[in-house]
C-alpha cells in the first residue's frame, strides 16, 4: 500500500489512489474497533501531541482514541493556558514543540493556512484537524468511508451538500474529495451561504432545496456556523428551517434509499428534523462518528510508516 506523504494537510494533496488506500486501511480498523480488544501496537514508541486552538469535543476525542488504540503516547495540550495566550507566535510554539521530538502533531486552528505553516517548521508528521474555512481532511475521509459502506461505491453518485457552505471547511474538503472520485455534487443553500465561486468546483448550485434534492443518493447537511458569521446571513432560524432544514417531506424528493449525513454538532430543528436525524433507516450520523476513529487510525498509521522509513 503506497502513501508517499509526510503530512496530511488537506484533500487537495491526495490522489484517488491515496484516498482509496486510506479508506481500505480504515476498513480493517472498523473491524478492530468492534472487537472487545481494540488495541494495536503500530504506533508503539511514538508520541502524539494534540493541539486544538479551537474548542472541539468529538474531533479531539476521536484523534485521542485513535492514537491510544494504536499504542501511541498521547498528550493533549491545553491551548487556553498555552504560551500563545501570553503572546508567543505560532512559529515559536512550533519550534518549541519540535525541540521535544514528537512524532505526530494533530492541529486544529481558527486561521486558514496556519496548520500548513506549522508543518513547515517541524520535523514530525502533521495532521490537519481543521484550519479556518480551508480544509478538514479527516472529516471528508470519514464521510467518504461512510458513503462507500452505505452505497457500496464511492463514484458516480448524486450527492447534495446543504446549508452553510460559505463558512464550512467540511464542505470544501468534501467537494474536493467527492469530485476526485467522480461524483456529481449539488450545493444547496441561500445565496448568502453558497458563494458563486463554489461553482468552480464543478458543482451545481441550488437555492431551492426541493429542486436540489431531486433524485440524490446522499444528503449531507451542514451546521450553521454562527461563530463565523457577522450577521445578515439568514433572516431567522425559523425561516431557515422552513426553507433549508431537512425534514421527511423534503427528503421524499431524494431517492428512496438516500442516506442522511451531518458532521455534527447538530442544531436540531434548524438544520435537520430531530426524528429524522435519529432514524436508523435513513440517517448514518452515528456511523460517521464510528468511521472517524477508524479513518484517523489509518491516516496516522500511514504517516507513521513513512516516518519510520525515513529514519
Curated annotation (Swiss-Prot):
Enzyme Commission number: 2.1.3.2
Matching Pfam families: OTCace, OTCace_N
This protein's record includes keyword Magnesium: no
Substrates-to-products reaction catalysed: carbamoyl phosphate + L-aspartate = N-carbamoyl-L-aspartate + phosphate + H(+)
Pathways per UniProt: Pyrimidine metabolism; UMP biosynthesis via de novo pathway; (S)-dihydroorotate from bicarbonate: step 2/3
GO cellular component, one term: cytosol
Residues reported to bind L-aspartate: 86, 169, 223
InterPro entries on file: Asp/Orn_carbamoyltranf_P-bd, Asp/Orn_carbamoylTrfase, Asp/Orn_carbamoylTrfase_sf, Asp_carbamoyltransf, Asp_carbamoyltransf_Asp/Orn-bd
Name of the top EC class for this enzyme: transferase
Disulfide links within the chain: none
Amino-acid positions noted as binding carbamoyl phosphate in the UniProt annotation, renumbered to this chain: 58-59, 108, 136, 139, 264-265
Swiss-Prot/TrEMBL GO biological process terms: 'de novo' pyrimidine nucleobase biosynthetic process; 'de novo' UMP biosynthetic process; amino acid metabolic process
One term of GO molecular function: amino acid binding
NCBIfam families named among the record's database cross-references: asp_carb_tr, PRK00856.1
Function recorded in the entry: Catalyzes the condensation of carbamoyl phosphate and aspartate to form carbamoyl aspartate and inorganic phosphate, the committed step in the de novo pyrimidine nucleotide biosynthesis pathway.
Protein family (similarity comment): Belongs to the aspartate/ornithine carbamoyltransferase superfamily. ATCase family.
PANTHER family from the UniProt entry: ASPARTATE CARBAMOYLTRANSFERASE, ORNITHINE CARBAMOYLTRANSFERASE, MITOCHONDRIAL
Protein name per UniProt: Aspartate carbamoyltransferase catalytic subunit
